[in-house]
Amino acid sequence: MLSQTSIPEVKEDVIGYALHQRRARVGQFQDLGPPDLITLIKSLPSSSSTTTATASANDNGATSNINGQDPTTIVTELHSHDKLKGQIGTFFYCMGIDTSDPTSITIFAKKITDLFLDTPQIWFGKKKHFHVSKISISSWNAFRKYDVNIIVHIPGTVQTYIINSDGEQSQLPSVAEASSGRNSQDLNVNMIWAETFMSGIVRDIMIMKDNRADGESQNLVETLIFNPFTSGELEDVANNFIKLFPLVYEKGVYLDAPTHVLNPSLTNNYLVETLVEIVRLTKSLEACRKMLKKLIEIHPEAVIILIRVYFACDLEIDAVDLINEQLNSPSSFLADDSKTSHIQLIFKSELLSIQSEFLLDVKRDYKLAKEVAMEAVNCAPNEFKTWYLLTRIYIKLNDMSNALLSLNACPMSQVKEKYVLRRIAPITSDENLHLPLPLDASIEEISSLNPMDVQLEQKSADPNLVNLSASSLKSTFQLAYKLLTEIVQITGWEQLLKYRSKIFVMEDEYQGSTSSIDEAEVRGNDISKMRSKRLCERWLDNLFMLLYEDLKTYTDWQSEQLYFDAQNSKYHKLTVEWELFGLCAKRLGHLPEAAKAFQIGLSQRFSPVCAKNLLQFYIDEHKRIRRDSVSANSELTSSQILSSINDIDSSIIDLVVKICCWNHRWYIEFSIILIDALSVAVQDMGITKVHNEIASRFSDPVAQLIDDNILNFLKNFTNDTFDN
C-alpha cells in the first residue's frame, strides 16, 4: 500500500548530504552492511520553468558526454551540494525492494516518483506540489564490499556507479553492454547484480529473524520496509534467491552469522540462515532440494544445509536418514581425507548438533542426546552452541551440577551483536524529520496513541523495573541467562546457591586462597575442597546477580498482587510497568504470569511490546494444545480441544491485525512473526474464512491492509500450501 503518507523522509540541509555521508563511511560498513538509501531531489512548480529545463539539459549533457568524462566528475555533478532555487533534497532508508538488476530498480523508482505527479504532498502541514527530478538508490553489496548507486533522472537516463571500500568510484556498465563483451571487466556485471540482490534479501530476512526474540524491533524511524517476497518486479524473489544461491555459496562466510555462531563456516552463516528461512516461509522445498543436490556434487558438505531445510519443512524422516548416512557411511564427505581434519570436525560438529537438538526437542531421548552432544563438544569445543545444547540436555536430565559446569564452560562472545539497522546519515535536527501518519488503514486505539504520552509514561515508571539489567543482555549472554533461569525454575534459588558453592569457587575466594600460602597450610582441608572445584567465570557470576534481581522483582510483584486481590482492590500500574513485569516473568520462564501482565497492559492502552509477546504466547499455546491432543495421556475431549483452538485463533487474528496496523503506522509492511502467526489461523480455518473474520471485525481499509501484507503472501507466494 505505497502512498505519500507511507514514506518517512528526512529533509537535507544541503542537497546530496545523505549520499555524501554514506560514501564517507563506506570503508566502515561491516558484514551485512546498512539498509538501502533512497534520496530524492524535488522541485516546486514556481521554479519549474527554469529548473526543469536546466535539469533536462544537464541530464542530456550527462548522457551524451558520459563515455568521455571521468566517473568521479560525473557523480560530483549529479549530486552537487549547491542548493538550486526551488529544489530540496530528502532521503530515507528502505528494505525489501528488488535490486536484482537496473530495470527492477528503475520500476521501483518510477513508483516512488509517480506518487507526486498528480497529488500535492502535505509537507510539514502545507500542500506542496512537488516534482521529483532525480532519485538515487544505494544498495550495499556485502560479498564484494561495494556500494552500488543507481541514479534515475526524471525524465531521462539511468546511470549506475560502484563505490568500493576505499571510496573509489567507477561507472558500472549496463547489463546489455556487459553481454556484448566490450571488455573483460564487463563480465563481472551480472555477478555484481546477483550479489547485490542476494545481499539485500539476506538483510531483509535477518533483520526480522535475528531480532525475533525482541519483537523484530528496529530503531531507524526513517526506514520503509516492504515484504521482499512480494516486491519482485520481474521474477519471483524466492525462486531467484534459490537459483542464485550456488553462485555466492563460497562467499557466505563473508556475511558473518547469528550471535550464537562464533566461527562462521560455509554451512553456518547468514546466507544459509536466509535460505532455510526463505524455504520455510515460501514452502519452496522442491526448487531448493533440486538446487542443493546439484551443489552437493561440487561441495559435499552442503548436505548439512539440505538436512536443515528438511527439518524446517517438517521432513524429519528424510533429515534423520541423511544424518545417519553422513555419520556412518564410508562414502560420506566426512570420510574425505583430502579435507583438513579441522574443517571436517567443524562440519561434523554441525551435524551432531542438529542431531542432538532433534533428539532433545522432538524425540525427548535425553540420554542419547547427551552422548551425541558430548561428541559435538569434542569436535568443536570453541563453539557456543555445542556447550549450550549439552547444558540444555543436562537440565532435562535433572543433572544440575553438570548443567552448571557445562554452562560455565560455554565460550562467550564479548563483542558479537545481532544484525541491527544503523543510521548512516545523522539527522541534523528533529525538525527535518517528516513522518506522515498513514491514514489509509488505521485503528483508533493505535492511531490516537500519542508518542509523547508514552515517553512521559516511561519516565514515570518504577526505576527498579526500568533498571533491571537482565533486560539488556545480548548475544550469547542472553542465551546463557535463559539456561540459568531454567535451572532455578527446577531447583529454586536457595538450592541453586548450594549447587554453586558446591561446584564453584568464586573469583574473590580464589584470589584470596592463592595470596596466603601459610594460612592455606593451616586450612588444608578447605584448600583440598577448593581444588576440587571449578573457578566460576566472571560473566556467570554476574548472571547470578542479575537472576537475583529478577527473582526479587518478580516475587515482590506477585506478593503485592496477591495482597491487593485479597483486599478486592485494583492493582494500579502503568502500561509500561506491566510490560516490564511481563518481560521479567517471561525471562524467568513464568509464561502464564507473563501473559496475564501483557493482557492487563493491553487493557489499558495499546502496547506493541505487550501485543507481540502475548501473540507469541498464543502461538506456543496453540502448539502445546495440538501436541497434547495427539497424546495418549490427554485429558481434554475433542470438543474442548476444538473450543480452545478456536479461542486462540480468534485471539491471534485480533493481535495480528492490531500489530500490523501499528507496523503500518511506522512504515513497516513486513513481519515474519505476523506471517507465522496468521498462518496458524489460516491452517485451521482457510484463507477465505480468516479474511471474512477480519472483515467482520475491522474496517475495509484495515482488512485490505491484512490482505496486502499477509494473506496475499500466504495465498500467492507459498506454492499453494494453504487452502482457500
UniProtKB/Swiss-Prot annotation:
Its main location: Golgi. The keyword Protein transport applies. InterPro entries: ChAPs, TPR-like_helical_dom_sf. Residues 51-71 are annotated as: Disordered. It comes from the Eukaryota. Residues 711-724 are annotated as: CHS5-binding. Residues 51-65 have a biased composition (Low complexity). GO terms for biological process: chitin biosynthetic process; Golgi to plasma membrane transport; protein transport. GO terms for cellular component: exomer complex; membrane. One of its GO terms (molecular function) is small GTPase binding. It is found in: Golgi apparatus, trans-Golgi network membrane. Belongs to the CHAPS family. Member of the CHS5-ARF1P-binding proteins (CHAPS) which mediates export of specific cargo proteins, including chitin synthase CHS3. Present with 3460 molecules/cell in log phase SD medium. This is Protein BCH1. The gene is BCH1.
